[in-house]
Each structure stands twice: as structure tokens, then as C-alpha cells.
């Protein structure tokens, strides 16, 4: 089985390209919060989706799409890549797929397709997970070092000027005795 190789497309020749829906992987990532860019509920989302998975799911829904690998996600600078999906019929506001009326339903359908394509989601690489043995050694119970005992003595001195404009009272001087 040979996989189709992506080809370069001149988007200036595609009519209405600017009106295509833009989908980032964060929009359907169930591991993220709404503040980080998730647009569907956690139940409908997918754990760490990739651009090729989203493109394959979109193609199965009968919607043409283009992967733009050079584009970045505005909320995360280092997340590169997005999809542009031709949602509407040419020159109209009618959706290509009558079962998908808007973008939210589109995102849910894409996530459902990805769950069917790859039900066992791989865990993302987390370099911090490799530090677990080191943390276990460093978090052993340490006996506290004996601290010197200090005694604080407060002495008072009478006020030097009786006609001061500040609040009255005795000045306190703290002295530490070891």
C-alpha cells in the first residue's frame, strides 16, 4: 500500500481560499483547556491529534483540505501547522456536507473519525517523565539539621524628645541572644 505524497499547491489559484475554515490540532485536543484553544468538550475531543489524522478524517467526511505546515498557532508559538478546510460549496454559503451545518459540528465529526481511525491514542513524549527515578532519590526523607536556639529580648528606651510630631510611645529595640 503506497501512501499519497503531499503536493505543493498554489493557493492563489483557488477561488475563495480565504473563506475556508481554519482548524488547528488544539481545537480538538482533549488534553487542553478551553483557554489553551480547545473548541469542543473533553468528551468529544481527541487526545493529542496530529495534522495527518485530521486531514484523513476530513477527507473521509468528503471535504477537501490543505495542510499548511508553515503556519503557527497564535496561542502557542512553537505549535506549527494547521488545516484549511473547504466547508462551503463554491460561491455559496451552503455546506458541502448537509449533515455538518457549522464549524463546531465539523470539529466534533473530525474527532469522531479520528477515534475510529486510531482508537488507541499514543502518549506524547514527555521528557519530565524520565526524571521520575531522580526525583524519587532526591525526595527521600531528610532529617532536619539542628538549628541554633535564639532568644529575643526586647528592651525599651525612653523617648528622647517629648515634643515630637510623630506618634508617641516607646521605641523598641530587638536584640538576639544566642
From Swiss-Prot:
Residues 148-167 have a biased composition (Low complexity). InterPro entries: Signal_recog_particle_SRP19, SRP19-like_sf. Component of a signal recognition particle complex that consists of a 7SL RNA molecule and six protein subunits: srp72, srp68, srp54, srp19, srp14 and srp9. Residues 168-178 have a biased composition (Basic residues). Transmembrane segments: none annotated. It is found in: Cytoplasm; Nucleus, Nucleolus. Keywords: Cytoplasm, Nucleus, Ribonucleoprotein, RNA-binding, Signal recognition particle. It comes from the Eukaryota. SUPFAM superfamilies: SRP19. Belongs to the SRP19 family. This is Signal recognition particle 19 kDa protein homolog. It comes from Dictyostelium discoideum (Social amoeba). GO terms for cellular component: nucleolus; signal recognition particle, endoplasmic reticulum targeting. Residues 135-178 are annotated as: Disordered. The keyword RNA-binding applies. Its main location: cytoplasm.
